[in-house]
Swiss-Prot record:
GO MF annotations in UniProt: N-acetyl-gamma-glutamyl-phosphate reductase activity; NAD binding; NADP+ binding
CDD domains in UniProt: AGPR_1_C (cd23934), AGPR_1_N (cd17895)
Descriptive protein name: N-acetyl-gamma-glutamyl-phosphate reductase
Family: Belongs to the NAGSA dehydrogenase family. Type 1 subfamily.
HAMAP family given in the database record: ArgC_type1
Record Pfam families: Semialdhyde_dh, Semialdhyde_dhC_1
Major subcellular location class: cytoplasm
EC supergroup of this enzyme: oxidoreductase
EC number(s) stated in the UniProt entry for this protein: 1.2.1.38
Organism annotation: Methanocella arvoryzae (strain DSM 22066 / NBRC 105507 / MRE50)
Amino acid sequence: MLKIGIVGGTGYTGGELLRLLSIHPLAEVTVVTSRKQAGQPVDTVHPNLKSLTDLKFEDPDPAKIAERCDVVFTAVPHGAAMAVVPELLKYGLRVIDLSADYRLPTEKFEQVYNKKHLDPREAVYGLPELHPEVKDATLIANPGCYPTGANLACAPLIAQGLVNRAVVDSKSGISGSGQDPTEGTHYPNVTQNVRPYNLTTHRHKAEIEQEMLRLNNSTRIHFTPHVIPSTRGIMTTAHLFVDEPLTTDQVQTIYDEFYKNKPFVRLQKPSLANVRGSNFCDIAFEVEKDSDRIVVVSAIDNMVKGASGQAIQNMNLMYGFDERTGLWTSGLSP
């Protein structure tokens, strides 16, 4: 049985890791940490886990974690992981980091997040549909939620060198903003409303550009996010402008081939309800007649495929498990 530690278990992503791993047949959580909640039962913070775990939060001590774990998920705020990851790696642990600390090159990270990086090192970007090398990784940088939906929508056509410009519009549920309440997540400001924000400057744009330019360095990327009155889910609409007209059959073939043997990508009409609670990404497209535009839409659960589920998918691949293990479940439709 694979032994797992979770550093930072009180937030949404930590709670989702605990929920999903509670039914994983080949892994068990042996350590979950929180400085503020040390000594408290996990279910006092995550009451949905009552009767599913007897764990208590502990202070984060890398040496003690290493004695009881094989792999560690770090689910801490941006800027905090870089302080703990080096210690975990020093003890021979494999690490899957759910923060942004290792997703970008050091200089780009410092520019985008306005923080000095304390631990410049390379990690494998953990989008397994694009990075099969996750299976051999010691440190995985789990992708952001917006980039997951955007990159999976855009990658097949961009990888073919067919797209000169991509205009990406994403709409996310409120949980993507994290657990701490803000003016932007306050119920009266969210309900019956759609709130665009960081129209041209959202920090996840850097991840989308990084991955798509790796596939084709001449594609221009534009990205704008919105918050919608939903707890979970991201619906992404990508307007892809191509150099030469393509038929529907041609595009279908490209997507079929690209995602062949990628079990968590389903080519069907996207719906947030159909992916909620699951690790699936549903994708569909439409070719605009007499135009250079192809519209691709993707749907994911931002807490699962956009965060904790994808992290477990990466873990499965790292340890030679079927990537579906513990994750092969439908969305909660309706």
